[in-house]
Amino acid sequence: MYKKAIIALSLITVSGATLASAPVANLKVTGSITPPTCTIKGQNEVDLEYVFDVSPGMFPVSGNLLLDAKTNSIEVVCDASTYLTFSSTDNRASSVLGTSVYNFGLGLYDTDQKVGFYTITMKNLTVKADSSSAAQAVGASNGTSYLSSLTIDKTKKMAWATAVSTLKAGQIFSADLDVRPTLSSTLKTSSGDAKLDGDATLTFAFSL
């Protein structure tokens, strides 16, 4: 009889636990991820102009004419710390003289004659952690090469970095962009309507 009482009590206890309503706590995690906002010289879109004056007398006796480089500076300011890269698009790609990932087209003259090409070199790169910090000199990386001065490869992204695969985070990014044209030797005998008409777009991207 004693044994039966124990069994009965055990069954009642289990049944009571099954019927009881347990308290529940729902844990919810909310929030938003806001990417940084970056501008170039305080604007979303700017034009960097390079003007070259060329005369027939500047051409060598034979071969193409290589002009001296001209420089423009860029400064990208972000409202939060980020990594910064950019890709390049040659809007005159069909007019490139010679085949190279480094050459950008300079347009056409006499309907279908190519003016030449130009290269863009990125140098004097710096990054500031914020507006009150000192600028830190860094290098340029395209994912496979890392140098203090690097010619832009149209097929790769350029980045402010401290090594090939190590991008540098910050809020203020600066660099000089050197443009150096090479003009076709055929321009010496052109009809006079030739002009340099290079046009490229640098599209910046940033990440947390």
Task: Report the location of each language-model feature.
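Mature extracellular/passenger domains of Gram-negative fimbrial/pilin and adhesin proteins
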Residues: 2, 20-208
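Sec-dependent signal peptide recognition
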Residues: 2-8
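N-terminal signal peptide c-region/cleavage motif recognized by signal peptidases
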Residues: 15-17
